[in-house]
């Protein structure tokens, strides 16, 4: 089993990645794709009048501050546009892909960070 993480920064060519994924799947390789979408999320948040906010820890690590509205924007972009876009691209290449989010079946959960 291969777990492939596709980043979400600007400039990613999803068509090239999906071509490779389709080739692996058709060759019999079990595969899970995990994707990002931060660049698109930032753009959509700006368009909706809710620009991203970041906090920096004492050690210098920067994280996105996620309030309820930001979480809704994340859900719209990650679960909607990015996830279903990748599923569509895989389907057109003959891969019977299924798109899930961490909310589906509580696939993953994590503790909330203190800020």
Question: For each predicted feature, which ranges?
Answer:
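Nucleotide/pyrophosphate-binding catalytic subdomain
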Residues: 1-115
């Amino acid at each position: 089993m291969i777990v492939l993480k596709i980043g979400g920064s600007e400039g990613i060519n999803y068509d090239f990645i999906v071509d490779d994924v389709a080739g692996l799947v058709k060759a019999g390789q079990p595969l899970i794709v995990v994707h990002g979408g931060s660049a698109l999320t930032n753009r959509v948040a700006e368009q909706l009048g809710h620009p991203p906010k970041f906090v920096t820890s004492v050690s210098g690590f920067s994280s996105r501050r996620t309030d309820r509205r930001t979480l809704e924007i994340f859900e719209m972009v990650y679960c909607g546009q990015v996830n279903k876009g990748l599923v569509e691209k895989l389907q057109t290449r003959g891969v019977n892909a299924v798109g899930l989010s961490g909310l589906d079946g509580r696939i993953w959960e994590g503790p909330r960070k203190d800020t």
